């Protein structure tokens, strides 16, 4: 098959996405497919004639990927480095290349459904969840409302907009310690744990650096787990134990910063309960094929 692995984009998780896309592209090539790893924002060339026979030189034209930096990318610099200086989310020839493929593998992180909606309009086949479920899953406020309405437990919390922000946590009915996070971010970028009023104010400032809307939740001390779901069925549970601090951007992607154990050491009853909730989440949000 001719496959475009779509990665990068104008997202704070841009670098993480490249690493994901690179691993996917290599695995697909090993299985005999012609694969192009493509940056959705930068695109490829600005000449239509350069697309002729492009899948026959797929590795040559693919994005070259190195390691993941310890800090999130500066998106202003990314935008400034684009050759055509366009504000179009799709780089040159991205739509054309995707239309030439048999399917697009979505390796983007922080995707909110907009690309899926565009691909639906263009008739481009892609992997994973459609536009509506992607948008819901990316929005923590909306997804939490759906979880609670379905009886899926979630931490006590409140949403806040920058325009009506207050640094008085008592107005939210939440006590310290608390977690402050952007509403639609990923990879723990902009996430802080605040233990007092001074840390809370700093946490608000940090979260608002990335987004106009944020979530403030009670801090639940405990272990961290990840549960994948494929075709509605939960996979074995992974426990993630950061060596230091919480599972932030640095600990997620720096080698040796966290210890992962699979299957997690849990009782059978707890394992079944967690897997049940993971399957419920996928069902409530309408997530197709795979989720985590």
State each model region's role.
Residues 1, 6-10, 268-292:
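ATP-dependent carboxylate activation and anion-phosphoryl transfer catalytic cores
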Residues 1-7, 11, 15, 19, ...:
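Active-site nucleotide/adenylate-binding loops and adjacent lid/helix of ATP-dependent enzymes
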Residues 1-132, 136-138, 142, 161-169:
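ATP-binding N-terminal substructure of ATP-dependent carboxylate-amine bond-forming enzymes
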Residues 39, 214, 218, 286-292:
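A short glycine-rich, hydrophobically flanked beta-strand micro-motif that places a catalytic Asp/Glu
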Residues 108, 182-183, 218, 282-286:
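Short Gly/Pro-enriched turn/cap motifs at secondary-structure boundaries
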Residues 125-130, 154, 236-237:
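Short hydrophobic/aromatic-enriched beta-strand-loop microsegments
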Residues 195-276, 281:
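Phosphate-binding site of ATP-dependent enzymes
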